């Protein structure tokens, strides 16, 4: 995607209010927003609830359609839709992960996954919806197999991190799992084809140009050959791999550091997300959102990235999550300690400039 040297602006189109505590996580429902299906966003909060927001076809504004409550008794830290959009997984500080089934707009808790010793921090579905991963403060990563009738079986408990695991994320097209932690590392997990055992195949840490403090989040580009991560060390790092070799089943393919973006946030960067058309968004404890794109004149092997836009005071407090819409390329949602969710649209500010001249 070519981003010419013109001015862009991130316009706030709606502020979603209703949560009574900080909002931790966001998840856009897949396959919504096309063929007349409305865009749907889930948000989860320290108020122990999940809210489902749906865009009105007539007004274009988002309205709260459901509040998922009375299941978790502590903070809901993370939420994720299954690829089909039929199930929503929610991870909570109460040490459980709940599975909600969406039937005609109504949500029923159909399964509760137990096993973590304490707070569950993150939940992620693989591309086919056959596996679910969770992680927590107990330093472990759990992989669950999705069985018929909304049953879930733990197939592996991965004990590689030495501290709290902040996030798990499946690769967008392959059954390879990534986790990031308070131990300053990202770990890559893969299944051994011979004996079905999951094991760590690579650790990205300080020794291979990785982060020097807590890694809070990571995200993949659309083709799955690059990954972006963010950290308490105030940097954003881009990693790359040989995706064709990986897809061919070569188990020796590794991820390498490509670029470090620093000096753009002055407090902890809590969230990064890569849009389908190549824009990296970041949200941080400095209440700001930043957008980055790849430099057109960078080399294939050593790409560099430039700041596309900065939005100061995007929220009144820390920004915990930024998520691009899966269907609307230029729509971004953000969640904050200020208890709100905001919907943003990215556009050129050229039109506004001409009108004001």
Where on the chain are the PLM-derived regions?
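WD40/WD-repeat beta-propeller blade N-cap
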Residues: 16-23, 68-76, 113-120, 158-165, ...
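Loop/turn segments within WD40 beta-propeller blades
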Residues: 27-38, 79-85, 124-129, 169-175, ...
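WD40-repeat beta-propellers
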Residues: 50-54, 97-102, 123, 141-145, ...
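A structural motif specific to WD40 beta-propellers
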Residues: 11-13, 61-66, 108-111, 152-156, ...
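Intrinsically disordered, low-complexity acidic/Ser/Thr/Pro-rich linker and tail segments
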Residues: 1-40, 46-51, 56-58, 297, ...
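Conserved strand-to-loop turn within each blade of WD40 beta-propeller repeats
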Residues: 44-48, 90-94, 128, 134-138, ...
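Blade-level signature of beta-propeller repeat domains, shared across WD40, Kelch, NHL, RCC1
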Residues: 323-355
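Short loop/turn segments immediately following beta-strands, especially the blade-tip
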Residues: 2-3, 54-60, 101-105, 145-150, ...
């Amino acid at each position: 995607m070519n981003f010419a040297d013109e001015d862009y602006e991130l316009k706030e189109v709606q502020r979603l209010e209703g949560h009574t505590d900080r909002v931790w996580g966001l998840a856009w429902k897949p396959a919504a927003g096309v063929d007349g299906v409305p865009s749907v966003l889930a948000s989860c909060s320290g108020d122990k609830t999940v809210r489902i927001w749906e865009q009105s076809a007539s007004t274009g504004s988002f309205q709260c359609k459901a509040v998922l409550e009375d299941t978790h008794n502590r903070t809901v830290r993370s939420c994720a839709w299954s690829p089909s959009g039929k199930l929503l997984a929610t991870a909570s500080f109460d040490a459980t992960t709940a599975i909600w089934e969406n039937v005609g707009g109504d949500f029923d808790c159909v399964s509760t996954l137990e096993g973590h010793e304490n707070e569950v921090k993150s939940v992620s579905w693989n591309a086919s919806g056959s596996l679910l991963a969770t992680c927590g403060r107990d330093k472990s990563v759990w992989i669950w197999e999705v069985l018929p009738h909304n049953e879930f079986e733990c197939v592996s408990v991965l004990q590689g991190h030495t501290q709290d695991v902040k996030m798990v994320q499946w690769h967008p097209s392959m059954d390879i799992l990534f986790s990031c932690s308070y131990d300053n590392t990202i770990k890559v997990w893969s299944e051994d084809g011979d004996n079905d055992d999951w094991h760590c195949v690579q650790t990205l840490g300080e020794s291979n140009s990785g982060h020097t403090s807590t890694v809070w989040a990571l995200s993949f580009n659309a083709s799955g050959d690059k990954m972006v991560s963010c950290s308490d060390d105030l940097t954003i790092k881009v990693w790359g791999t040989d995706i064709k070799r990986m897809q061919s089943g070569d188990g020796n393919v590794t991820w390498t550091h490509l670029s470090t973006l620093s000096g753009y946030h002055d407090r902890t960067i809590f969230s990064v997300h890569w849009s389908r058309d190549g824009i990296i968004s970041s949200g941080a404890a400095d209440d700001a959102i930043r957008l980055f794109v790849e430099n057109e004149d960078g080399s294939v092997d050593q790409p560099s990235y430039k700041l596309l836009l900065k939005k100061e005071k995007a929220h009144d407090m820390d920004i915990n999550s930024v998520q691009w819409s899966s269907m609307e390329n230029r729509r971004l949602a953000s969640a904050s300690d200020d208890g709100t969710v905001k919907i943003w649209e990215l556009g050129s500010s050229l039109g506004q400039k001409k009108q004001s001249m």
